[in-house]
């Protein structure tokens, strides 16, 4: 018991000293002045996965993979981000962000589903899955930058990889023709505009927000993208902090590319808990 008490007292003393060092270094959050900020954590996402694959027939409605096919509507994703500030007065920055989702499920269909020239009939047992990867690279410049504030804007690019499938027995006149699985996939680079604002009310606290947006017709792909994050960061030690934020990502597009003619309306949203390291 005495050893536990000593350990707790030592830990409290260490945190107190760490807080003193942070306060002495700057009156405001060190993320605003340091060159590198790395964060890694968990993104607890609620997912809306509505995808359409018309095939060569040019028919088909959006399939809600969560409601119709039983694909997970919520799961925990790995979330990583790195920002590097450089140039005169460190007003330029390069930011990378990555998260991915690989969700599967199965269900007995409550209604007919059309997918890639195939109609899976009501009452058929099907399995399905959606895999989605987002890699973001953003180059920005701060227009208002001091110890307490950082406001900037810039240009970025999102590399998006999306694939989906549905598999099940094909019924013709109450007879099965066997199991069929049909896939749809596409990859696309989407440029975007973006802006951010960071505000430090005190040495340990940072409020931050970011928004990316694009609406464009790129020939084979026509759609709109929103990617935003707002949150708060607590600096526990000089180079380590803890971050709680809310992430919202939405992609709504139509595509006529490769083996996929159709579209999708995909949303990932929810809290992100991460550890930040700055230097």
Model-assigned labels for residue ranges:
Residues 1-34:
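Cleavable N-terminal export/targeting peptides
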Residues 23-101, 276-278:
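Short glycine/proline- and aromatic-enriched beta-strand/turn motifs that initiate or cap beta-hairpins
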Residues 24-29, 81-88, 140-145, 199-203, ...:
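Outer-membrane beta-barrel proteins
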Residues 38-44, 96-100, 141, 153-159, ...:
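Transmembrane beta-barrel strands of outer-membrane/channel proteins
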Residues 40-42, 80-84, 137-141, 155-157, ...:
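Residues on the lipid-exposed face of transmembrane beta-strands in outer-membrane beta-barrel proteins
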Residues 48-76, 100-133, 160-188, 216-221, ...:
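Extracellular/periplasm-exposed beta-strand and loop segments of Gram-negative cell-envelope proteins
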Residues 90-94, 147-149, 203-207, 238-242:
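Repeated loop/turn-to-beta-strand initiation elements of outer-membrane beta-barrel proteins
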Residues 206-223:
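Transmembrane beta-strand segments that form the barrel wall of outer-membrane beta-barrel proteins
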